[in-house]
Amino acid sequence: MIPKVIDLAAPVAAQFNLEVVGAVFQTNQSPPVLRVDIRNCDADTGLEDCEKMSRALEAVLDEDDVFPEAYVLEISSPGLSTLLTCDRDFVSFRGFPVLVQTHQPYRGHHQWIGNLTGRDEKFVQLNQKGRPIKIPREEILQVQLHDSPE
């Protein structure tokens, strides 16, 4: 169900220069809540972005009848532990602690934690307790904000 929601939401978001970064269907509430997280990579994600996305996505979901029962649609921007995906993220969060996960062990590790110092075409760079680390981008599965300093 969530993959279908994301497939429907992505082109709606693109109309407003937004991207869908995740979706969750919380069935432990009554009525259930469908939360879709969006991000504006050109500017801070604002309430207006969420409102536009909510109105447009609601129409698409109703038309497709994804959820025949009653539900609540929430559109929000992601918080801490957010994946860094676009150039703006890597600039905005320079100096912040991040967790880098690799597809396979790189220098013996699947995970690297350090302060983000940059990203270029080839590498994501971290400072790990004063030691610079360069991880090849092709080895990286994901980069996300981390809640603890090095």
UniProtKB/Swiss-Prot annotation:
UniProt keyword terms in alphabetical order: Cytoplasm, Ribosome biogenesis
Gene Ontology biological process: ribosomal small subunit assembly; translation
Keyword Cytoplasm found: yes
Protein's cellular compartments: Cytoplasm
Primary subcellular site in the record, as a coarse category: cytoplasm
Keyword Cytoplasm: yes
GO cellular component: cytosol
Role played: Required for maturation of 30S ribosomal subunits.
HAMAP family (alphabetical): RimP
Family according to the record: Belongs to the RimP family.
The name this protein goes by in its record: Ribosome maturation factor RimP
Source organism: Acaryochloris marina (strain MBIC 11017)
